[in-house]
A protein has these predicted regions:
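Catalytic-site neighborhood detector that most strongly recognizes the C-terminal catalytic loop/helix
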Residues: 173, 271-297
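N-terminal core-binding DNA-recognition domain of tyrosine site-specific recombinases/integrases
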Residues: 3-4, 11-96, 112, 221-227, ...
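Short, polar N-cap/turn motifs at the start of nucleic acid-interacting alpha helices
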Residues: 159-166, 262-282, 314
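Proline-centered turn/helix-capping motifs that create local helix->coil transitions or kinks
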Residues: 92-101, 161-165, 201-210
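Basic, Lys/Arg- and aromatic-enriched nucleic-acid-binding interface segment
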Residues: 70-74, 78-80, 93, 97-155, ...
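C-terminal catalytic core of tyrosine-transesterase DNA break-rejoin enzymes
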Residues: 93, 136, 140, 144-151, ...
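Active-site/catalytic core of tyrosine-dependent DNA strand-transfer enzymes
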Residues: 172, 193-241
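C-terminal secondary-structure termini that scaffold catalytic or DNA-interacting sites
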Residues: 164, 175-198, 202, 218, ...
């Protein structure tokens, strides 16, 4: 069996059912554009660490197979290597290989999250501007719940339990070509502030017959990621916050939750991280900073500051 044949089997048997749709699509891109052109026709039994090493070095220096392409960055190389290693690990479990030649190589750990965490004043400016532009419900939810962009636009109205103030997020639902696609049933549930629930109720009242949480008014279909980025860019331009990316809303939610006293394991569940170790790695600088503050200042002051941080999002909701 060639590597190409096994990768196709691995994608359909394992990856499609274990990964989010966007992750599956990203994996498919890496296989198609980087791994298969060089290694696809090699039998698994003949794949050695020398062959894998030459492949990785070639990709690092010369990039993909298009003429004139430049070398690949460290993050892309790490992703290629990790994906190949993951696939070959499964080949061993399937009894098709005795060892994994990709494990002969190591890449440095990825850098910690480089986040722009909004200050309380910036959050007020951002949300005030979102309200003026008519975008408040979507972006208030993004900021207070830490949702990914793809999760946000794929929400359905019945994901919200108004009575319990909970939102169930489907981790295997996505918007593709302006249609909702379901790939599985994996979910996580988070609790929302009552003010956010009230905003969502008002948003749904605009289109009470739509199953969508957020429906584009002109097309009556889900928003595309490009549309959400356009709306976000409109907000930050008018608010004078050009340095704030959409993903910084999620980071801000995470950091404020830590300052609130939320445990890392609980935050990992809220953000949809598969392992708490990912959360600890991403937000280690903030965890260390908080630990140092607790050690360096009187306990009373620490509790007072934590209480102030705990009230930030609540105060923002009381316009």
């Amino acid at each position: 069996m060639t590597l190409r044949e096994y990768i196709l089997f691995w994608q359909e048997t394992y990856d499609r059912h274990q990964s989010r749709p966007t992750t599956y699509a990203a994996h498919n891109y890496v296989f198609k554009n980087h791994i298969l052109p060089s290694l696809g026709d090699i039998p698994l039994s003949e794949l050695t660490s020398e062959i894998v090493g030459e492949f990785l070095e070639e990709r690092r220096r010369f990039g993909n197979h298009r003429p004139g392409s430049s070398g690949l960055g460290e993050e892309t190389m790490r992703h290629i290597h990790r994906l190949l290693q993951q696939c070959l690990d499964q080949a061993i479990r399937d009894g098709l290989m005795s060892d994994n030649p990709a494990r002969a190589f190591r890449y440095s750990k990825p850098k910690k999250v480089n986040a722009n965490v909004l200050t309380p004043l910036e959050m007020e400016d951002y949300l005030d501007t979102a309200e003026r532009l008519g975008h408040l419900p979507m972006f208030m939810l993004a900021l207070t719940a830490g949702l990914r962009q793809g999760e946000l636009i794929a929400l359905k109205w019945n994901d919200l339990n108004v009575k319990n103030r909970t939102l169930t997020i489907s981790e295997q639902r996505s918007v593709e070509r302006r249609e909702l696609i379901e790939y599985g049933s994996e979910t996580r549930t988070i609790t929302l502030a009552s003010e956010v629930v009230d905003l969502l109720i008002m948003e749904h009242a605009k289109n009470p017959n739509s199953p969508l949480m957020f429906m584009h008014p002109a097309t009556q279909r889900p928003y595309s990621p490009q549309m959400v980025r356009r709306m976000h860019n409109e907000i930050i331009k008018e608010a004078g916050l050009d340095h704030i990316r959409f993903t910084d809303l999620r980071h801000t939610c995470a950091v404020l939750s830590l300052q609130n006293g939320m445990e890392t394991k609980e935050l990992a569940r809220m953000l949809g991280h598969y392992r708490p170790s990912i959360t600890r790695q991403n937000y280690e600088p903030y965890l260390l900073r908080m630990a140092k503050k607790e050690a360096d200042i009187p306990k009373e002051a620490t509790q007072r500051e934590l209480q102030q941080a705990a009230n930030i999002l609540e105060n923002l909701l009381k316009f």
